[in-house]
Amino acid sequence: MERGMNHRILYPFADFGDTVAILPANETQRKGLDTPVDDRDGDDSLVTYFELARVMERASRRFSGLLRAELTKLGVEDIGPAQAMVLLAIGEAELSVGELLDRGHYVGSNISYYLKQLADGDYIDRIASQRDKRSARIRLSEKGRQLCAGLRQAAKGYERALSHGDQDRRNLETAFQTLHRLELVWGNAARYGI
């Protein structure tokens, strides 16, 4: 890996041992490697699914910390990052609890707790269903909309810092698509096996 980023700078505490660098096809030909990169055994890959899952978990924790810091900057002390993500999942929609569960892939007991906190803090409005008085629809209150707007504004700053052109935006889109595909595959594997 003569060109490109130094992985020791990006991952200073990682031990890559004897890992194989995955090079683009034109790099493979220049280096004289006989085996195409895509045909190599899965054990030789630079990243395993477990390593990817660990990075995703760390990124999730870092994002949660960042979200907590943004909530503090906005003067919000009564809810945490998980509840803020529920507000963002609701967005401009009016949803039933079941629809919110599907949209955010939440656990039922967690969402009930989050919704109670959000209702107690006046971040959401609960509207009783006309057809079934036992069920309710949920939407953001004005306070919830203002908080979401503040969080979206803060997110734009991070997006500008991360995106320096079309290639960065395409890379972000590719990363999103890949992570979404992994979510679907892993979810189906957990439910139905492979």
UniProtKB/Swiss-Prot annotation:
Annotated phenotype, changing residue 29 to M: In strain: EFB1
Location of the HTH marR-type domain: 49-184
Effect of residue 142 to V: In strain: EFB1
Pfam families tied to this protein: MarR_2
Keywords (A to Z) from UniProt: Activator, DNA-binding, Plasmid, Transcription, Transcription regulation
GO BP of this protein: response to stress
InterPro entries membership: HTH_MarR-typ, MarR/SlyA-like, Tscrpt_reg_MarR-type_CS, WH-like_DNA-bd_sf, WH_DNA-bd_sf
Substitution effect: residue 92 to D: In strain: EFB1
SUPFAM superfamilies per record: Winged helix' DNA-binding domain (SSF46785)
Cytoplasm keyword on record: no
GO molecular function: DNA binding; DNA-binding transcription factor activity
Source superkingdom: Bacteria
Annotated consequence of substituting residue 166 to E: In strain: EFB1
Function summary: Transcriptional activator of genes for galactoglucan synthesis (exopolysaccharide II or EPS II).
PANTHER family: TRANSCRIPTIONAL REGULATOR, MARR FAMILY, TRANSCRIPTIONAL REGULATORY PROTEIN
Protein's name in the database: Exopolysaccharide II synthesis transcriptional activator ExpG
Organism: Rhizobium meliloti (strain 1021)
